[in-house]
Structure formats: structure tokens, C-alpha cells
Amino acid sequence: MEHYGLQTAAGHLTVPAESKEPYAADVEAGFRADAAQIIARYPQKRSALLPMLHLVQSVDGYITGRGIDLCAELLDLSTAEVSGVATFYTQYKRHPNGRYTVGVCTNTLCAVMGGDAIWEAVSEHLGIGHDETTDDGLITLERIECNAACDFAPVVMTNWEFFDNQTPDSTIKLVDDLRSGQDVRPTRGPDKVVSFQEMSRVLAGFLDGRADQGPGAAGASLAGLAVAHE
């Protein structure tokens, strides 16, 4: 059964044609080489499934049927087993994703600190709702749950990089800068936000050396830790 695609109003999934097309020979060879490195990290092959799914997204931009088939083959799993995992976690996208995934935290603290207002403003500004993508293919917008950064609420994530203490205006500027092609630096971590596919490769375990370019744990977090130790 095919599980990947856009859901229609009737509840059916429409699957992009390229989702089922075989990989080009050179692309598949590169995938298999990267997969071998991932699998070698684990005592059991099936344990490599999560990073393997990120690898699929680094190649295709979302979880494709061909990616599912290749993961199943390489890990000695059924396609149903792979599909079950890929449909459980929200980081795995079942239809083409934008270059940047912008997630607005609307969990309790972020919501009361302004997350709901940010969501309404940026959703209206972009003309899209949850898990929808702008017509230019650049921004996919999401409501997200807590990212363990409550001391910087409200928080917006872009390809899983932190943008702390956001406002409706700052978030609208963020998405406008991304769409105009400007380099955008998150509050913490790397010196700029990379694309969804580039970040997916990092999440597959192929580090790009950017994580420590900026501050990691910020002052408020460290102050809280010090109080907890007293």
C-alpha cells in the first residue's frame, strides 16, 4: 500500500509520480554508499531506520516511495514496517516539502507569550496553514510542539534551528528574508540556516561542522541551571 502523498478532502492520498520512479544510477550508488556508513554504526541493521529516513529526505526532499523501498531492502524490513515509522514521526514529510520548514511553537508557554499571535500573523502573511507550502516552494509552515526552549518563549524553528523571543513582526521578517535568498542566522548554533535537504543530511549523521559556530546554551538557560544546582 502506498502511504505517501497529499491527502485530498475525501481522505485519499495522491502520490507524486516521481515518488515511485527509480533513482538515477549515480544517485542510487551515492545513497547506498551513505547508507552503508549509517548501518555500520549499529549492532542491528534495523536500528538505522531513523537516520536512513533522514537520508531519504536529504536526497528527495521528502519520504518517497522509492526511498521507502530502498530502506526496506537495505535494512531487511518490510515496506510496511518502514512506512509505519515514517508516518509516525512528524519530522518525516509525506509530500514535497519547502526549502525551509518554519515551525511556530503554540504549546502552552509559547502560546501565552505570543506564539498564537505569531502563528496567526505569519499564516495570514504567507497565505498558508499548517503543513502547507508557499507557491514558490520555499516555505512550509507548521504548528509545532514544545522544543525545550521555554525560557526563550515564544520560539520559532527554521529547519530545526532556534529563533528565540520572537514576535509577529520578527517572524514575518524571517520568512521574507528566507524567501528573498538572504542568509539568515539563528539565535544559537550555526552561522546560517541551511536548506531542509542539507539539514536532513546532518540529521542522518553526516555533520557539516556548523553546530558550534554560534552560542549553544544561552544565558537564561545557564542561569536556571545554576539555580537548580544551589
Each language-model region and where it sits:
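Signature of N-terminal electron-transfer/Fe-S-associated modules in redox systems
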Residues: 1-230
